[in-house]
Amino acid sequence: MSMSSSNITSGFIDIATFDEIEKYMYGGPTATAYFVREIRKSTWFTQVPVPLSRNTGNAAFGQEWSVSISRAGDYLLQTWLRVNIPQVTLNAQLGPTFGLRWTRNFMHNLIREATITFNDLVAARFDNYHLDFWSAFTVPASKKIGYDNMIGNISALTNPVAPGGSLGSVGGINLNLPLPFFFSRDTGVALPTAALPYNEMQINFNFRDWPELLILTNTALVPPASPYVPIVVGTHLSAAPVLGAVQVWANYAIVSNEERRRMGCAIRDILIEQVQTAPRQNYTPLTNAMPTFDIRFSHAIKALFFSVRNKTSSAEWSNYATSSPVVTGQLVNYEPPGAFDPISNTTLIYENTNRLGAMGSDYFSLINPFYHAPTIPSSIGYHLYSYSLHFFDLDPMGSTNYGKLTNVSVVPQASPAAVTAAGGSGAAGSGADYAQSYEFVIIGVNNNIIRISGGALGFPVL
């Protein structure tokens, strides 16, 4: 039986191989010594999470409301929305073919729009589509399960319940949504709330109503009929669902008196990210397989997100595949055999030039995110084109000023599967065996500059 062996003396052989190429790679006055660590000191601070106070409106389904951003903390680091989802019971008198479930990505789709304002100046906004794209391209696999648990992708909410069954649990289920405003991206761009005494700062929400989020299906309805059934209170539910406790939490940094004094002493410009969503437009592969959509974005665009959303069910928001989910008993197959990317290839045109000519969807869904994004989406239908070498990086690494471009348009050619599904001629059980309808969604992520001056926030470049 052999014994493993090694000795220190052999390492000196490696050291003796130092030659010209090693002179290029090692040594010199700026070389790093990996065995003598230098401590990088920070300023003295602490951080504390606090709930924000309600300002206007009622935090309920279908309502607009807002919270005030406190100036008690020095820097606002992160914010998140915490919502209690009520238990919902399907009427026991219905037939056994009925099933009730909440939409996927519930916390994304609850939000029609969220904004942050400074004296009514909207500094940033996002909607449910941006939340879908942002999480698909930035949440790493190591956090994906936890993120799904936070936003409602759990069996207790998304698996259908039969008549007499209940979604959720007694007392409701608490869900959390990290709000991806610009100040949450890095502590270096945290919002200096203590330096803004002359701004009334608010986070504003527009919530969708519960019928836009709750899905009722009846599998007794066979193609070409759609299995989706409009929900009627009194027939399907005993009462309309009502949200439980709703809170917005904020994580603040509190700094030393010396640093606080310096915060308002000089003008400060901060490079931030903003989101622009183009108006959604109908996508009809049966009548026009190569539609042209005009894009009117502005500022320095660093990344484009786009997709074709399947809107066959108005409450099935986060479906970017050719087919609808297929319900079998108490299970849902969100990517059944008929689920494919609705887009075959895409052309991006501006200044009468093909910036990208008929690039296959595999480029936008796999290759581009492989090189330029933190992660590749695990679901069908997400597309990215990044002008930045790494769009998740805060430093400028590439962009194009869409405000200086003319006649910008995108041409997403429909895939054969989209044409088949739009006509409802897919195979039985494919989710495409009844007519599917679609809309085109495109979002731009741009850089902008905010200026902190004289106790207020503004835009030096609008």
From Swiss-Prot:
GO terms for cellular component: viral capsid. It is found in: Virion. Keywords: Capsid protein, Late protein, Virion. Coiled coil: none annotated. InterPro entries: Capsid_N, MCP_C, MCP_C_sf, VP_dsDNA_II. It comes from the Viruses. It holds the Pfam family Capsid_NCLDV. Gene3D superfamilies: Adenovirus Type 2 Hexon, domain 4, Major capsid protein Vp54. GO terms for molecular function: structural molecule activity. Major capsid protein that self assembles to form an icosahedral capsid. Represents around 50% of the total virion protein mass. Homotrimer. Belongs to the NCLDV major capsid protein family. This is Major capsid protein. The gene is MCP.
